[in-house]
Amino acid sequence: MTGPITRKDLMIVNMGPQHPSMHGVLRLIVTLDGEDVIDCEPVLGYLHRGMEKIAENRTIIQYLPYVTRWDYLATMFTEAITINAPEQLGNIQVPKRASYIRVIMLELSRIASHLLWLGPFMADIGAQTPFFYIFRERELIYDLFEAATGMRMMHNFFRIGGIAADLPYGWIDKCLDFCEYFLPAIAEYQTLITRNPIFLERVEGVGIIGGEEAINWGLSGPMLRASGIQWDLRKIDHYESYEEFDWEVQWQKEGDSLARYLTRIGEMAESIKIIQQALEGIPGGPYENLEIRRCNKVRDPEWNNFEYRFISKRPSPTFELSQQELYVRVEAPKGELGIFLIGDRSAFPWRWKIRPPGFINLQILPQLVKRMKLADIMTILGSIDIIMGEIDR
């Protein structure tokens, strides 16, 4: 009598695109051997909207409302990179007051983005309580945004040569009060989360990335700094007025999910330091460069023709892009957000290439989850911090 034949079949599981832990419309095709992950294939494109092609058929001013739909949780950074590119292309000077206000808004947006990463990340690994504490602080930041820009999200606040409006009366004091309140809140997170043995069991030693490996994969932001590489564009490129403030680059050397968590927690405290220094030293003066707001190009009489209204011609230009190319980048919450811009002496970019940090960082996911358990996929994916709006564009 022969014994039973044991078969070893692999199981293929689809995670997403409608899965609460995917952080957007991301689909993962996971090959499993029991609970062990054999392979993982990310499927992208569910949120593709042709953002680069739209940019090439719009003036910079017309395109500004679109860019807040890339990373819709850190919209100040997408606005900053959109106006920094033509500013450098046209050698436009930004008033010091506008530069300080930009720094304040960027760092507030960084804190809000990290908070909205931390809450769902904790929920993914089974900790529901910190989620509500974290959203309490995030709501205060959105109140500050609403008072200054009129919008809680999708602010449309940055302009070429400055910002849309000056800070309202009493806003600086309100923001300083928030900074004093938020620093003890970070210590509260440390007590609730960092010293929790169950949390440490889920994240420590999970998804390890070495320093050389992180560089070879093109990682940036907290993903790179958590692997021992002290690389922060705010220190390296000296854009806006970051060189005038005293702060430290946050980094860890372990390269695991815990290191990425600690890096982002430290960045929130450093952002508060930058905001406090900017608020206390904010100069007076104008908040925009009025000269570049004027159109220097002579209007074409053809634009007034009756037939012109019906043939889908482009509107009159607002800012002429010189015939050259450049790459501009900023340190966004998720990593290096860049724009490759080619001008051709018109108001419309000849080429507008977006370098999204989440898209680059997501590439390493299949390698990180191999030979891990199925439950570790949520931990590793959450530690990467992705937003599908900027990944699919």
UniProtKB/Swiss-Prot annotation:
The record's keywords, sorted A to Z, are: Chloroplast, Membrane, NAD, NADP, Plastid, Plastoquinone, Quinone, Thylakoid, Translocase, Transport
Q: Where in the cell is it found?
A: Plastid, Chloroplast thylakoid membrane
Can you state which reaction this protein catalyses? a plastoquinone + NADH + (n+1) H(+)(in) = a plastoquinol + NAD(+) + n H(+)(out); a plastoquinone + NADPH + (n+1) H(+)(in) = a plastoquinol + NADP(+) + n H(+)(out)
What does the record say about its membrane topology?
Peripheral membrane protein
Among the GO molecular function terms of this UniProt record, one is: NAD binding
Residues annotated as signal peptide: none
Query: InterPro entries from the entry?
Result: NADH_Q_OxRdtase_suD (IPR001135), NADH_UbQ_OxRdtase_49kDa_CS (IPR014029), NDH1_su_D/H (IPR022885), NiFe-Hase_large (IPR029014)
What domain of life does the native source organism fall in?
Answer: Eukaryota
The record's EC number reads 7.1.1.-
Q: Which GO terms describe its biological process?
A: photosynthesis, light reaction
Any one of the GO CC terms: chloroplast thylakoid membrane
Q: What class of enzyme is it?
A: translocase
Looking up PANTHER family in the UniProt record yields: NADH DEHYDROGENASE [UBIQUINONE] IRON-SULFUR PROTEIN 2, MITOCHONDRIAL, NADH-UBIQUINONE OXIDOREDUCTASE 49 KDA SUBUNIT
Q: What does this protein do?
A: NDH shuttles electrons from NAD(P)H:plastoquinone, via FMN and iron-sulfur (Fe-S) centers, to quinones in the photosynthetic chain and possibly in a chloroplast respiratory chain. The immediate electron acceptor for the enzyme in this species is believed to be plastoquinone. Couples the redox reaction to proton translocation, and thus conserves the redox energy in a proton gradient.
Please give the family membership noted in the entry: Belongs to the complex I 49 kDa subunit family.
Binding partners and assembly: NDH is composed of at least 16 different subunits, 5 of which are encoded in the nucleus.
Annotated protein name in UniProt: NAD(P)H-quinone oxidoreductase subunit H, chloroplastic
| Organism, scientific name | Fagopyrum esculentum subsp. ancestrale (Wild buckwheat)
**Lineage of the species this protein comes from:** Eukaryota, Viridiplantae, Streptophyta, Embryophyta, Tracheophyta
Query: What gene does this protein come from?
Result: ndhH
